[in-house]
Amino acid sequence: MADETVDTLVIGGGQAGLTMSHRLKQRGIGHLVLERGRIAERWRSERWDGLMFQFPNWSVRLPDFAFPHADADGFSDTAAIIAFIEDYATFVTPPIRCGVEVTKLRRDAGGFVADLAGGSIAARSVVVATGPYQRPLRPALLDDHPGLFQVHASSYKNPAQL
């Protein structure tokens, strides 16, 4: 038996999870967003120093919320993107719990149950909005060379690491 029940559970508090929360609220659908870190955590902890967003500012937007910029054709840095996502969260006011990690998701008769470190939540439906690249993928060939230095983009910060 789950400790809590919601209609829809959204896993992930980045731009996709916040957008889903916004759309669910607009439709009057009860939901809860769970984020393992802070809002926009992967932008904070899994990006390298000096990263510039790969799309021009004019193309950056979230539903009902434009990206404020001084140069439409420019590219924003990570701090500006984090601030934008935080501002969007303030605009959306999602029912969110940060610092909560889903350790397992399983089906049950009523939908799904998400296991957490401190309990469980049942939901009729679940949206997984964790992004496509949570786990580094390294070629198995590299296992044969344990002394070979490797760094994945998710943990790279700057040239001093190399």
Task: Name each model-derived stretch.
Residues 9-11, 120-134:
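Short hydrophobic core segments
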Residues 98-112:
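A conserved short coil-to-beta-strand element within the FAD-binding core of flavoproteins
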